[in-house]
Every structure is written in structure tokens, then in C-alpha cells.
Amino acid sequence: MTFNEKCVEAQVGNMNVKISTGKMAKQASGAVVISSGDTMVLVTVVGTKEAKPGQDFFPLTVNYTEKTYAGGKIPGSFFKREGRPSEDETLICRLIDRPIRPLFPESYLCDTQVMATVISAEEDHDPAILSMIGASAALMISDIPFEGPIAGVKVGRVDGKLIANPSAEQLKLSDLEIVVAAGKDAIFMVEGEADFVSEEDLLEAVFFAKDAVQGILAAQEELARQVGVAKREVAPLVVDEALKAKVKALAFDRIAQAFKIKAKQERYAAVAQIKEEVVAALAEEFEGRDKEIKGFIGDIEYDRMRHDVLETGIRIDGRDTKTVRPIAIEAGLLPRAHGSTLFTRGETQVLAAATLGTSQDEQRMDSLYGEYRKKFMLHYNFPPFSVGETSFRLAPGRREIGHGMLAERAISAILPNHDDFPYTIRIVAETLESNGSSSMATVCGGCLSLMDAGVPVKAPVAGIAMGLIKEGEKVAILTDILGDEDHLGDMDFKVAGSADGVTALQMDIKIGGVSKEIMQQALKQAKEGRLHILGKMAQCLAAPREEMSAFAPRITTIWIKPDRIRDVIGTGGKTIRSITEATGVMIDIDSDNSGKINIASSDKAACDAAIQMIRGLTDEVEEGKLYMGTVKKIMEFGAFVEVLPGTDGLVHISELDETRVKNVTDILNEGDKVLVKCIGVDKQGKIKLSRKAALGQSLEEKD
């Protein structure tokens, strides 16, 4: 059997990308295998032929799955098969989804599913980037209407040089890591993190990415021409102009009045009442068309908000385009948490709590390339009461995972070096109220909770969300957007960073991309807003607290010779267990065989006792050093003195005193404490001690 396989390829930075179709999954609407190096991803798209009756939204589903066989592994779960998506898989789903979602015609409402399955994986060739390109390519060759192509690319920077799709080793040296989705003429999505990079440098990186994908965009168009599948006809949305006119006559002026209400819940209640009354007024003439009527009122809301901002520069809550909402901050309000902050910005409020732990609290993560551990975690929660709603809640959804990761990236850049501050850190952000930009409030509250916990952060960071309203040549960029401005606007651009530069950003576009000039202005306004917020944060906490919470563990680091680690552990872990049971501390021995040991306890005396026990097991007797020992055995020729636990040496009778000693027992007896000096260790490891050499000295003087 032969396959009618078609193939294109193009260079995207460090990756030579090959896209083929016609061999696998031929019953899908569109299917490609996209590869680079040893990484291969099967991307399929399927769109139903007709929309469901009454369908009024676009049901797009994106799934991304990493098969463990792709990395030559067997799943570690009890059932030995892939289960629910990991956090990384969920985040990559969002990367694929966000840039393609705005590129379907408004009238296309058929069920559509994109599935990206990693079937072979190599670390230097990122399957996430290939999946983004593959999703666009599969849509391009299908009959599904799609206004692409788009392509994704990862950008790093090493020694000031921008690199498209850097290798894993290059990323370790890079001071930025962003993923950009772009088309021929515009940017559709940006997401990533940086080490205090300037806005100008970020803008350069974003448009460097746009240039880098032009070859693979052309390759997708060529593949679509080779396949030659015609796009299906999609009828434009049928609008009942008579009904629309009657709805406008009844609702337009009332919506305009409702939009003067600044409080979110009151405004929502007023709009809801208008909808119910208009539906009731038209019920007899237009029976059963409630959803359509409410849709027309939604269109009025959309037009009203946008018109007011573009024509007057005044927003729903009365602000101009550059003003940040009022901010209130309270730190240290949870007495038992290691650090806590209540951050309120307008009608958005986040309670952030920081907890410090040991290496035993690190999160074990499994990937196609092996296991790794996370020392910093940020978990974002969005309960329904934060927007005055009810719902059944189980695990965090894609949105919560995505918002949490964005805030985690923003804060990770300011964390101290782990060798200097060897704690595992977890921040939990509880969204208590939401009216836009709760993820950026999480950055602010999360940073302050670390400072309240006494974590020596490099610099405070804050976050702000920017919006866009664009009608033709008229453009308004909005600082610190509300929920309505996010919903009814054209862009959600979140930027986080310190006074010195950006640490994380995320941009989603609902229109056909944005220009360099718009991004430049948005970044400029974002910096102004960020500096304002940092000033407010400094009024609450200008620097990390000097003392950690009394309830946080204290970690002390000591170093021993690597070949003595076995003495601390003991047979089957017996020795280390006995130390932890005797003192109540937690002991962590670095797995890299460096000899580094962390001892954690909130009780300093217990920590000191554990250190003394470990030192006793691992310290070696040094020539010329004083020891306070215990006489273990008396012999005619001298006394054996234990100077370290399990380690003794001989004090020869001639070394007992400056004068001649006839009997050892004239000077020492078993059980006596005696100060001795090591005067030598022979080749067999036998230790020679002297009481005589230690006379007139003390341990304090020696130290």
C-alpha cells in the first residue's frame, strides 16, 4: 500500500521543521505530522459539518497529550497509562488555543477539535512550538474556514544575541524566554518570562520572532496548495434587522445610563433588568427568541463601551485611559501563615499567603525528559463567590493553571539563590473579588507575602493588565482593565516586573493582530502603571522583614566530606533516623554527593544538637587541634581517650604531664574529662594524643 504523502519544510531558527500529510490519520478533517530533530507531533483537526441547532458560540476544543512512549518511558501511575493532563500539558493547550481562536469566521459555529499528540520527543526540539505550528498547518489543509496561517516560535537571548528556538543548554544561559505566535503581518500572542529585561529589548525580541516564522508560514501555504482541499462555504450570520431595530429602540438609551453606574454588581443588575424587561416587551411579537434579543442587547453593550472610550476617553468606571484603580494593601494579617498580604485594586482583591518549607516539600515533576523538582510553586484559586456566582468546583481549571503560572514566572525572577536561601517556597493566591486583572493582583500580593515572610527577594515586582479598543484608525490603550473591558475589548496584555525591567508578560489578541506601534505604547503605559503600583506597595513594605515568622522552619547548612555521608545515613538509614527522632529536626542530604546537609527546625537548640551529632559522626581528628575527651580505658603505658564519638586515641604515659608520671591513675581515671591535643596520626590511622601539650590552654583560646 502506498500513501499519497505531501511534505514541506522550512528553517525556524535552530529548528529545521518538516510538515507532512497523507500518511497518518487520514479520516480527520486535517492531519499533519510535524517534526524537527527526533521530535514528532501528530496534529489533527476535525470540524463537524453542521452547527448544533441554536448554537450561539464557537465550540473549539484543543487537546495536547505527551505520550510517555515518545520519551521511551512507561507511565509511573498504578494503571500504567496516561491519565489526566499534567500542568505542562494544560499550559501548552492554552498556547495552541489562544492564537488560533480569533482566526475563525464569526459565523462558523461548528464543533471543532484540535488534538496534538507527541509521539517522539527530543529536549532540544520543543514539541509545544511544533504543536502550535502543526495546529495551524492542519487547519490550513482542511476544509475548515481559517484565516491563517500562524506559527509559534520560542525566543531566547544569550550574551545580547537573540536566538529563535534555542537549545536546552542555550535556554539555561538566556535572560529571556518568550513564546510568540505571529502571522505574516501581525502578532497574535506573546507569553514568557525574563530577568528584568527592558521594554525596548522585549519589543525587539517579539518582532525578531515575527521575522523568524515567515518561512514556515510560506511552507504552510504551499502545503495547503499541494493538498488542494477547498474551504467549506460558511453562510454569514442572518440578522433580523426588524428585531434588532426594536431592541435598539427599547434598550440603547437605557444601556447608556446603566453604563454610568461605576459599581460592577449594580451595573450588572441594571443590565440584567433591562434584558428581562426588553424580552418581556417583545415576548408577544417575537415569542421564543429570548436568546436572540439578549444577544442584540449584548451588541449594544459592546458598541456603547467602545464608543464612549474612543470618543470621550472616559471608561465605564469614570477613569481616563491611563489611571490605575485605587489600591489598598495590608500585610501580615494571617497570624500563623509565614507571610500574608491582602491586596485590593478597585473591585479586584487577592489574599496571598507564603509558606516556607524544606527540600522534602519540593514538588516532584515528571516529564518526557526525566524527573525534576520544583522549589517554588504558586497556586492561583478563583472561587465562584469572587464574581458573585455559584458553581461545582473540583480540580483547578485551565484558566487557573494558566494564571498561576504567569504569576509564578513573574515572581521567580526575584527569588534569592537557593544556595543562599535553601527553602522550598509556596504561594497560594485566593481571589476573593474579581473585576479584571486578578492574575496581576496575584503578582503584587504574592511578592508582598514573600517580603512579609522575610524572604530576601532581589526586588519587589508588580503586575498590570493593559487593554485595547480599536475601530479603524481609532485606538485607545487602557491601563488596568476591568472585566468588561477585557470581555468587550480587543486585547488582554499583562505585564509584570520591577522598577528595572520586565519579568513576565502575556498578550492575547481578539482581532487580526496588533502592530509594533500599539505594542510599544502598551508597554510604555504598562511601565508607568507598574511604577505607580510599586510605589503603593513600598508604602506597605519597603523591604523584606528582617525576621522570619516564628512558625517558619530555620534551615542551617553544613558541609561534610562526601565520603562521610554514609556515616550520617547509617545502615538502612538507622543513624539519620536516630538523629531526627532524638532532636525533632528535618535533615536533608543533597543527592549530588557534594557533602551539603540542610538541617531544618523552628527550635534553634534542637538544630544545634543535631549539628553536634552530625559533626561527631563526620569530623576527623586533626593534628595540632585541641579536644575535650573522655577517658575510656586505662593501660599501664597510657590512657585511651575518646575525642569524637567512636573515635579515640592514646595518651602515652610520657605525654600525661610535664613531670615524670609513675602510674597513669595518678593523673587520669576512666570516665574523666580531659583536654588533649592531637600530636600525630600514623599511617594506620592510630591517633596520638598529649595531655602535656594541652596544659595551660583552653578550647576557647584555641578557637
Curated annotation (Swiss-Prot):
Record keyword Chaperone present: no
Provenance organism: Trichlorobacter lovleyi (strain ATCC BAA-1151 / DSM 17278 / SZ) (Geobacter lovleyi)
Pfam families recorded: KH_1 (PF00013), PNPase (PF03726), RNase_PH (PF01138), RNase_PH_C (PF03725), S1 (PF00575)
Entry protein name: Polyribonucleotide nucleotidyltransferase
Residues the entry annotates as binding Mg(2+): 486, 492
Cellular localisation: Cytoplasm
Lineage, opening ranks: Bacteria, Pseudomonadati, Thermodesulfobacteriota, Desulfuromonadia, Geobacterales
Classification via SUPFAM superfamilies: Eukaryotic type KH-domain (KH-domain type I), Nucleic acid-binding proteins, Polynucleotide phosphorylase/guanosine pentaphosphate synthase (PNPase/GPSI), domain 3, Ribonuclease PH domain 2-like, Ribosomal protein S5 domain 2-like
Taxonomy, superkingdom: Bacteria
Cofactor: Mg(2+)
Chain ranges of the S1 motif domain: 624-692
CDD domains: KH-I_PNPase, RNase_PH_PNPase_1, RNase_PH_PNPase_2, S1_PNPase
Catalytic activity field: RNA(n+1) + phosphate = RNA(n) + a ribonucleoside 5'-diphosphate
Family from the record: Belongs to the polyribonucleotide nucleotidyltransferase family.
SMART domains named in the record: KH (SM00322), S1 (SM00316)
Major subcellular location class: cytoplasm
Gene Ontology biological process: mRNA catabolic process; RNA processing
InterPro entries documented for this protein: ExoRNase_PH_dom1 (IPR001247), ExoRNase_PH_dom2 (IPR015847), ExoRNase_PH_dom2_sf (IPR036345), KH_dom (IPR004087), KH_dom_type_1 (IPR004088), KH_dom_type_1_sf (IPR036612), NA-bd_OB-fold (IPR012340), PNPase (IPR012162)
One GO molecular-function entry: polyribonucleotide nucleotidyltransferase activity
UniProt KW Nucleus keyword: no
Reported function: Involved in mRNA degradation. Catalyzes the phosphorolysis of single-stranded polyribonucleotides processively in the 3'- to 5'-direction.
GO CC annotations on file: cytosol
Domain KH per the UniProt entry, residue ranges: 553-614
Key words of the record: Cytoplasm, Magnesium, Metal-binding, Nucleotidyltransferase, RNA-binding, Transferase
EC number assigned by the record: 2.7.7.8
